[in-house]
Regions:
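Short, acidic/charged, Gly/Pro-enriched secondary-structure junctions
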Residues: 70-99, 116
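Helix-start/capping segments and mature chain N-termini
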Residues: 1-65, 69-76, 102-187
Length: 187
């Protein structure tokens, strides 16, 4: 429960909804930031806000807010939360509209910011060590897609890699880039 900021309004958590024909649902046209907040302070908050805007530019999802405006929105969400140690998710996406094909310039870019309590990503593994799988999936070449954007569509590689790891009893997968060099884990 609580509130999510959506398109300029605070919306009750359970009422924050998007249409089934939202472009992002069909084509992955969204960008986001996942941020940790400790004691009411978001770690490297402005850097995240700037990266969100940059990701939007790279993915042709022009975010209709400045980094400073996003900072105020995130601060408001953190202030009304019931706890001060949070995970903050800022998300921008192409909404529903007249374009349901791949191109979506006429669909409004929407934005939301939510915050919730979310423990350590690896749980107890941060104390015991994590068992890692080497994923069969590779991070794409930067000539394929703007892979430096934090874009939802790119995260399907992470989802597949994480599922692969869990099916083998591992905490996570380590992914290589298109050249065979270590790139990242899924989270």
């Amino acid at each position: 429960d609580g509130y999510i900021w959506m398109d300029g309004n605070l919306v009750e958590w359970r009422n924050a909804k998007v249409h089934i024909l939202t472009h992002a649902m069909h084509y992955g046209s969204s960008v986001f930031e996942g941020e940790r907040c400790y004691g009411g302070k978001i770690f490297k908050s402005m850097e995240h806000s700037k990266r969100l805007i940059q990701s939007g530019k790279l993915m042709d999802i022009p975010i209709p807010y400045t980094a400073e405006e996003i900072e105020k929105i995130k601060s408001k969400i953190v202030d009304i939360a019931e706890t001060s140690d949070l995970y903050v998710r800022a998300l921008a996406w192409r909404g529903s509209g007249t374009d349901m094909g791949v191109a979506s310039e006429n669909n409004k870019v929407r934005m939301a910011v939510a915050a919730w309590e979310w423990g350590a990503y690896y749980g107890d593994a941060k104390f015991k060590g994590a068992k890692l799988n080497i994923s069969r999936w590779k991070r794409p070449s930067p000539e394929t897609i703007p892979c430096f954007a934090k874009a939802a569509g790119l995260y399907m590689i992470c989802t597949q890699s994480k599922h692969e790891a869990q099916s083998k009893g591992c905490s996570d997968s380590l992914m290589m880039d298109y050249r065979g060099y270590v790139a990242e884990a899924t989270g």
